[in-house]
């Protein structure tokens, strides 16, 4: 990882003036993360290493001299927690985008791939990113599945699997520990997972959403050291005071004004404040940016630019145990980014390992896929579906009335109850209700599809289908029309996964994701165009806006580790009690009606 001994020896000689630099960057304004100063200096580079940071004009001996013309020189930006799969791009295409924005290192939790492919998914993440100019630190996913007993993914990870992955040099720690319930209640599986991380000496990421007081203290006592699931400014401060590294994330921008205001009340900004993207869809990554977009939002909300940059550089390097990164200093890796202004950060030039890789938002040379690495395909072994597969039935009565539990809301769900009419054993959808349908897609059991009532999305006009749904990534369809639901699902089965919208017997939009059912092999610009089109057209199917929130809700609607009801491939689950719940409360038979014109599926 660090420069070899020969390069380091050459750097020592160049720093002393005994030999020339390979590259000399002159007329820079150094953004000093150690002192907070902005100071004029030149930077001499040997190989991939910074050899010297010295007064302007004091050295001219170099094989190449490049003027930065007064630009602000910062260490390369670092993303301390990202699910790269949320970009729906393979690693090399993702790297091509974020490198041009100034991000030179990421900590990748590939638990989406792992939930589909098991340990082989993590191996693919390692092998596909090892050759990249982007520094990719892979984490060993702890949440496969995120909630054992409530869902089935493509694998089950416990202590043995974690020990295997943590033994790989490219794996830098344990990824976010999402099973908070298991940690707090001492489940054997979670004790094994956390202990494997402690034994490895590598970092252990947290997912402490909603934890406070004694439960938060207990979570830290177990060995977890970070959290990116901040819910408010008070939550951020409590977690800082508890000793967690907080990772301010860009996927929840509505929290940023209050978090910045709270941080500005502190007498000292700790090195335990970092930044992450967590999840960024492809069009937003390409058009607005990843970490760079988050830093600009923090600056807009009043955080000094030097502090924002420190969160993404020195603080991130400390957090990720990368002592070769994070500062512009002799002996550090020459991963650097040049900005023309600190009021709005736009990367003018990006250097990785001393080589200029990007200029004015353009990569100077393409990045090839990893040689000899075959992306995993054919991960939806599901036979074609029929409209009859998308009918909600009540067992035990043919005609009558049933009282059912259902899911209310989208991302933050609540339990609801509703009385429905039953005709020929089929539920007549009430006004304002739609269906959510989930089918296991990993071939580990022959489960019948699960189906439940959904309220709070309006009456879906058609269907939305996805094979990318946290965290088990089973096949999920939402809709009100059984024919459209089957059409959208079959489109994904045929393409190997992705997302699709159907309405009135036609596919409105479709993004194919044939790699593990979650990554596309399209060029980034074309994928972004298709994804944007699909998201915009979703407003024709779902009533609520903005469309971005629709897709966040779709992707998280089966996340059984969160509080409230969720539908998984095993049934209707309760995140609080960790139980699978029968949706049927009561039913009674009534005389068969004479009017048979009602639509049993609500289609």
From Swiss-Prot:
Domain of life: Bacteria
This protein's record includes keyword Manganese: yes
GO process annotations (BP): adenine catabolic process
A Pfam family matched in the record: Adenine_deam_C
E.C. number(s) listed in UniProt: 3.5.4.2
Listed GO MF terms: adenine deaminase activity
Cofactors demanded by this protein: Mn(2+)
InterPro entries: Adenine_deam, Adenine_deam_C, Amidohydro-rel, Metal-dep_hydrolase_composite, Metal_Hydrolase
Catalytic activity: adenine + H2O + H(+) = hypoxanthine + NH4(+)
Family label: Belongs to the metallo-dependent hydrolases superfamily. Adenine deaminase family.
Protein name: Adenine deaminase
Lineage, highest ranks first: Bacteria, Pseudomonadati, Pseudomonadota, Gammaproteobacteria, Enterobacterales
Gene that specifies this protein: ade
């Amino acid at each position: 990882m660090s420069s070899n001994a020969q390069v380091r020896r050459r750097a020592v000689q160049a720093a002393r003036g005994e030999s020339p630099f390979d590259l000399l960057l002159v007329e820079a304004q150094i953004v000093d993360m150690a002192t907070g100063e902005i100071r004029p200096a030149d930077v001499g580079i040997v190989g991939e290493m910074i050899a010297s940071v010295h007064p302007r004009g004091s050295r001219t001996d170099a094989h190449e001299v490049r003027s930065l013309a007064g630009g602000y020189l910062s260490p390369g930006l670092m993303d301390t927690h990202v699910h790269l799969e949320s970009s729906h791009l393979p690693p090399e295409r993702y790297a091509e985008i974020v490198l041009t924005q100034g991000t030179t290192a990421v900590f990748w939790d590939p638990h989406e791939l792992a939930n589909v492919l098991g340990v082989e998914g993590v191996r693919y993440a390692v092998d596909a990113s090892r050759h990249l100019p982007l520094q990719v630190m892979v984490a060993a996913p702890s949440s496969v599945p995120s909630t054992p007993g409530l869902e089935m993914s493509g694998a089950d990870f416990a202590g043995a699997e974690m020990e295997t992955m943590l033994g790989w040099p490219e794996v830098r720690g344990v990824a976010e520990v999402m099973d908070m319930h298991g940690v707090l209640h001492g489940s054997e599986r979670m004790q094994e997972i956390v202990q494997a991380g402690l034994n490895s000496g590598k970092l252990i990421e947290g997912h402490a959403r909603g934890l406070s007081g004694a439960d938060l203290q207990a979570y830290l006592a177990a060995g977890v050291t970070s959290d990116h699931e901040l819910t408010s400014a008070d939550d951020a401060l409590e977690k800082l005071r508890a000793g967690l590294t907080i990772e301010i994330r860009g996927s929840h921008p509505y929290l940023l004004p209050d978090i910045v205001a709270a941080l500005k009340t502190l007498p000292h900004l700790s090195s335990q404040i970092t930044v992450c993207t967590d999840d960024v869809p492809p069009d937003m990554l390409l058009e607005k940016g990843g970490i760079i977009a988050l830093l600009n939002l923090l600056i807009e909300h009043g955080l000094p630019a030097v502090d924002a940059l420190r969160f993404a550089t020195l603080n991130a390097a400390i957090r990720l145990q990368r002592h070769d990164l994070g500062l512009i200093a002799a002996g550090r890796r020459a991963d650097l980014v040049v900005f023309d202004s600190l009021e709005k950060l736009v990367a003018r030039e990006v250097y990785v390992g001393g080589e200029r890789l990007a200029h004015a938002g353009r990569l100077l040379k393409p990045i090839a896929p990893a040689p000899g690495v075959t992306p995993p395909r054919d991960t939806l072994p599901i036979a074609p579906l029929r409209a009859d597969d998308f009918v909600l039935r009540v067992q035990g009565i043919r005609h009558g009335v049933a009282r059912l539990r259902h899911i209310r809301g989208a991302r933050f769900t609540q339990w609801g109850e509703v009385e429905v009419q039953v005709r020929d054993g089929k539920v007549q959808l009430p006004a304002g209700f739609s269906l959510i349908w989930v089918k296991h897609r990993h071939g580990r059991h022959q489960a019948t599809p699960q189906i439940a009532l959904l309220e709070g999305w309006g009456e879906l006009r058609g269907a939305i289908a996805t094979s990318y749904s946290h965290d088990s990534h089973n096949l999920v369809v939402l809709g009100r029309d059984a024919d459209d639901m089957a059409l959208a699902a079959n489109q994904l089965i045929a393409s190997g996964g992705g997302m699709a919208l159907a309405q009135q017997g036609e596919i409105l939009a479709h993004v194919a994701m044939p790699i593990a059912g979650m990554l596309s092999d399209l060029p980034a610009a074309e994928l972004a165009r298709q994804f944007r089109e699909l998201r915009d057209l979703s407003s024709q199917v779902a009533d609520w806006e903005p469309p971005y929130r629709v897709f966040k809700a779709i992707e998280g609607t089966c996340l059984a580790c969160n509080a409230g009801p969720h539908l998984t491939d095993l049934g209707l689950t309760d995140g609080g009690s960790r139980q699978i719940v029968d949706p049927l409360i009561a039913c009674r038979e009534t005389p068969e009606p004479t009017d048979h014109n009602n639509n049993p599926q609500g289609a």
